[in-house]
Amino acid sequence: RARVIHSLCTCSQLHFSEETKQVLRLSLTEFSLPKFYLLFGISKVKSAAVIAFRSSYRDRSFSPGSYERETFALTSLETVTEALLEIMEACMRDIPTCKWLDQWTELAQKFAFQYNPSLQPRALVVFGCISKRVSHGQIKQIIRILSKGLESCLKGPDNYNSQVLIEATVIALTKLQPLLNKDSPMHKALFWVAMAVLELDEVNLYSAGTALLEQNLHTLDSLRVFNDKSPEEVFMEIRRPLEWHCKQMDHFVGLNFNSNFNFALVGPGP
């Protein structure tokens, strides 16, 4: 990534403003710091030169890693993607006909909705981070992927990949909800998606589930959904078509939203 930024800084065919060049120089410095190596899973590196001349195939492990390592990779991917997006948008301001972001988004969407245990989770996260618009249908597709991940998680034995896929869909939904049309019924339904993830009682998914719940409440509050109705009234109303499924989840974790909404809301957790 640092080499790509360096190429942009030195390319004579691209003419950037001083402001853009400053963004590129600062980004190049930041990407050369040890903290950014860690985001790529690279540790114990003393300088940029060390990693530049290290063989990309040396010390590569093909054994399955722990889920903690994969969780780190997905959350790190958010940071890296947002940093690259900032660089791309700075460059695009000086290139009016530039289609870089459109092409990136198109590729991310293609792999996000295509089954591939290695690429799909990462593509979902990237798609969520870089998208500038989202449709009701795309959100439904992501929820279907989440549903398939849940089914695989319950059936096993590939619990590891299933949890990674679940986390990726939740991260994508968290990023995309603010882009949804304000009249979309998905806004309220995503509350129960977040609660379902939390009710799984998987410590590795708790952070992602909590982030989706927080984003959901902030978004609904900004849309003034709670001006005339309490959160309990809003969410229990949208729950009715899903009552049979929701009750099964509630029974599994020993909660009851019908009898005590507030207590049940704070109940799920690791």
Curated annotation (Swiss-Prot):
GO terms for biological process: negative regulation of fibroblast proliferation. GO terms for cellular component: nucleolus. Keywords: GTPase activation, Nucleus. Its main location: nucleus. The keyword ATP-binding does not apply. The keyword Nucleus applies. GO terms for molecular function: GTPase activator activity. It is found in: Nucleus; Nucleus, Nucleolus. Stimulates the GTPase activity of Ras. NF1 shows greater affinity for Ras GAP, but lower specific activity. May be a regulator of Ras activity. This is Neurofibromin. It comes from Gallus gallus (Chicken). The lineage of its organism: Eukaryota, Metazoa, Chordata, Craniata, Vertebrata.
